[in-house]
């Protein structure tokens, strides 16, 4: 029997449906329902949010399938789940469970330091993190249907997400202004498919949606990332590590939608309680920097 896999066009189209929205990390059915009621376009099912993964240390793996199954049964919006970088079997298990997207994630401890997954071996679409155009292009070349900035997960500090989004947008503009004979050299330097760079030159954008993630903790943070060109945002620890998750969730969704309405964002930001406690990224040791995982 011939293996059936989803085409790039179909999988990228599925990801396009999340454009302009907020995707929230959840660890149980109750949180998933809060996210759905707040207006999240999808949820990411985990055993622990990134800040807890960071605090616990050790090896972080795919969540217990019971957690993922609980979330799948609790909501009608799409459910994502994380697999370790390069871990073919974790990804196949998640696909068999019926998740809507798989995140090949640097938040988990990489299983393979040489190879990322060949996403075209799967029917389910993949989302992958990137710090710059080179990383984004390589993941898209492997079949990723959605890109997100890596940021620095679990810190509540947006500085790295801003750095990654600004760098990616600047590099896209550079490629758009290159002559066609410069593209091959650029493709070689980035380790990216020439045809992908040609698409970027002709359209001025990636062929997939590009979300912001890593350190988004407030409505203003979400609006900032949209202002910088993100197609939507992932919020990991920022919601359920806040004082008032329901209120934070609704406020971040609304700020993402109305990111240029600054009076509205001011109102949304009132009386939310404390945001999650943040970490100064500059204090992290090299081994603690999740964004450096993958290539």
Curated annotation (Swiss-Prot):
Q: Where does D-glyceraldehyde 3-phosphate bind?
A: 166
State the function annotated in the UniProt record. Answer: Catalyzes the formation of pyridoxal 5'-phosphate from ribose 5-phosphate (RBP), glyceraldehyde 3-phosphate (G3P) and ammonia. The ammonia is provided by the PdxT subunit. Can also use ribulose 5-phosphate and dihydroxyacetone phosphate as substrates, resulting from enzyme-catalyzed isomerization of RBP and G3P, respectively.
Pfam families (alphabetical): SOR_SNZ
Q: Which residues are D-ribose 5-phosphate-binding?
A: 25, 154, 215, 236-237
Spell out the family assignment given in the record's similarity comment: Belongs to the PdxS/SNZ family.
Q: Which GO terms describe its molecular function?
A: pyridoxal 5'-phosphate synthase (glutamine hydrolysing) activity
Kindly provide the name given to this protein in its UniProt entry. Answer: Pyridoxal 5'-phosphate synthase subunit PdxS
PANTHER family xref list = PYRIDOXAL 5'-PHOSPHATE SYNTHASE SUBUNIT SNZ1-RELATED (PTHR31829:SF0)
Protein's organism: Shouchella clausii (strain KSM-K16) (Alkalihalobacillus clausii)
Report the CDD domains cross-referenced here.
Answer: pdxS
GO BP annotations of the record are: amino acid metabolic process; pyridoxal phosphate biosynthetic process; pyridoxine biosynthetic process
Tell me the route in metabolism or biology where this protein functions.
Cofactor biosynthesis; pyridoxal 5'-phosphate biosynthesis
Looking up HAMAP family in the UniProt record yields: PdxS
Q: Which UniProt keywords apply?
A: Lyase, Pyridoxal phosphate, Schiff base
């Amino acid at each position: 029997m011939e293996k059936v896999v989803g085409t790039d066009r179909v999988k990228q189209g599925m990801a396009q449906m999340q454009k302009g929205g907020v995707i929230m990390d959840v660890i149980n059915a109750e949180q998933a329902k809060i996210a759905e009621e707040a207006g999240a376009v999808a949820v990411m099912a985990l055993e622990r949010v990134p800040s807890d993964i960071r605090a616990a240390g050790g090896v972080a793996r795919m969540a217990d399938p019971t957690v993922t199954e609980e979330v799948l049964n609790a909501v009608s919006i799409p459910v994502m789940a994380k697999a370790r970088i390069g871990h073919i079997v974790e990804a196949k298990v998640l696909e068999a469970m019926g998740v809507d997207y798989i995140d090949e994630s640097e938040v988990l401890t990489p299983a393979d330091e040489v190879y990322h997954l060949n996403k075209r071996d799967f029917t389910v679409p993949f989302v992958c993190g990137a710090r710059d155009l080179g990383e984004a292009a390589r993941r898209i070349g492997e079949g990723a249907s959605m890109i997100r900035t890596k940021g620095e997960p679990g810190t509540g500090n947006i500085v790295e997400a801003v750095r990654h989004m600004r760098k990616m947008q600047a590099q896209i503009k550079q490629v758009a202004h290159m002559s066609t004979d410069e593209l091959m050299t650029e493709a070689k330097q980035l380790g990216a498919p020439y045809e992908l760079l040609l698409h970027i030159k002709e359209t001025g954008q990636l062929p997939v949606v590009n979300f912001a993630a890593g350190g988004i903790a407030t409505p203003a943070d979400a609006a900032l990332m949209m202002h910088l060109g993100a197609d939507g945002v992932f919020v990991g620890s920022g919601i359920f590590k806040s004082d008032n998750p329901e209120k934070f969730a609704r406020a971040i969704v609304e700020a993402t939608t109305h990111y240029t309405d600054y009076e509205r964002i001011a109102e949304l930001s009132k009386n939310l309680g404390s945001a999650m406690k943040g970490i100064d990224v500059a204090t992290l040791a090299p081994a603690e920097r999740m964004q450096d995982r993958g290539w």
